[in-house]
Amino acid sequence: MKILNSLKTAKTRHPDCQIVRRKGKLYVICKSNPRFKARQR
């Protein structure tokens, strides 16, 4: 999982990527290709 300052590019890396908010943090999850997972600082 990458920890990024901005998720703007992370959400467009793959068509299945979606943004989720958990415990006040923003996450990008991708079920079909989990290496695109990311979290915002």
From Swiss-Prot:
For this UniProt record, the keywords arranged alphabetically read as follows: Ribonucleoprotein, Ribosomal protein
**Any one annotated GO CC term:** ribonucleoprotein complex
Q: SUPFAM superfamilies in the record, alphabetically? A: Ribosomal protein L36 (SSF57840)
PANTHER family linked: 50S RIBOSOMAL PROTEIN L36 2 (PTHR47781), LARGE RIBOSOMAL SUBUNIT PROTEIN BL36B (PTHR47781:SF1)
Q: What is this protein called?
A: Large ribosomal subunit protein bL36B
Checking NCBIfam families in the record gives: PRK00831.1, rpmJ_bact
What is the similarity comment for this entry?
A: Belongs to the bacterial ribosomal protein bL36 family.
- What GO molecular function terms would the record report? structural constituent of ribosome
Q: Which InterPro entries match?
A: Ribosomal_bL36, Ribosomal_bL36_sp, Ribosomal_L36_bact
Tell me where on the tree of life, at the top rank, the source sits. Answer: Bacteria
Which GO annotations describe the biological process of this protein? translation
